[in-house]
């Protein structure tokens, strides 16, 4: 569902995903400089197949998401360094998804009656847990588990209570932007 290929698109830094297409197999490599591909494969939800050029309408794409036939693909690893963001291709080990038995997927249903401001039901997302990939849920649950362990090991004081509150707000902010619906803001090099 790529609308464009830039990971970083600032005046001083240009990094992009370069698709390498071999038949119906699509891999990505990370390159620096101007991206030669002017637009992505997603135009207002309508998808253009990069292999054959045929178009899948937004309604057909939504039906695929509702039928749970779509899948996620890890495209890049982004690391923070003292000189800014570093972009690289995932290693084979990083492609491995967390075991679903280690993930407690939320099963609460969303209020789908009035979805004017939150249009996930049209894409087959009616349960809160469906908003997250297994990798995102594993990360969030690891944070909260370790946060709870930390809370049990340190004697409560006003300072630690303030620290716990800060960490809880931080985890909440991470959860808001780290969903499958999140977008990468390439000119700010951050998640939106």
Predicted regions and their residues:
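Nucleic-acid modification enzymes, centered on SAM-dependent nucleic-acid methyltransferases
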Residues: 1-192
């Amino acid at each position: 569902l790529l609308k464009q290929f830039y990971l970083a698109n600032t005046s001083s830094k240009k990094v992009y995903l370069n698709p390498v297409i071999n038949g119906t197999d699509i891999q990505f490599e990370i390159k620096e400089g101007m991206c030669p591909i002017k637009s992505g494969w997603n135009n207002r939800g309508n998808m253009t197949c990069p292999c054959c050029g045929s178009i899948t309408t937004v309604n057909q794409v939504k039906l695929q998401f509702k039928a749970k036939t779509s899948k996620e693909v890890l495209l890049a690893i982004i690391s923070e360094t003292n000189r800014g963001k570093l972009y690289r291709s995932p290693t084979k080990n990083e492609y491995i998804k967390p075991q679903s038995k280690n993930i407690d997927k939320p099963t609460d249903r969303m209020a789908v009656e009035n979805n004017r401001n939150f249009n996930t039901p049209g894409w087959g997302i009616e349960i809160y847990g469906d908003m997250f990939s297994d990798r995102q849920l594993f990360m969030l649950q690891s944070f909260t588990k370790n946060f709870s362990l930390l809370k049990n090991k340190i004697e409560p004081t006003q300072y630690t209570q303030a620290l716990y509150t800060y960490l809880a707000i931080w985890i909440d902010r991470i959860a808001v932007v780290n969903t499958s619906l999140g977008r990468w803001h390439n000119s700010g090099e951050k998640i939106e």
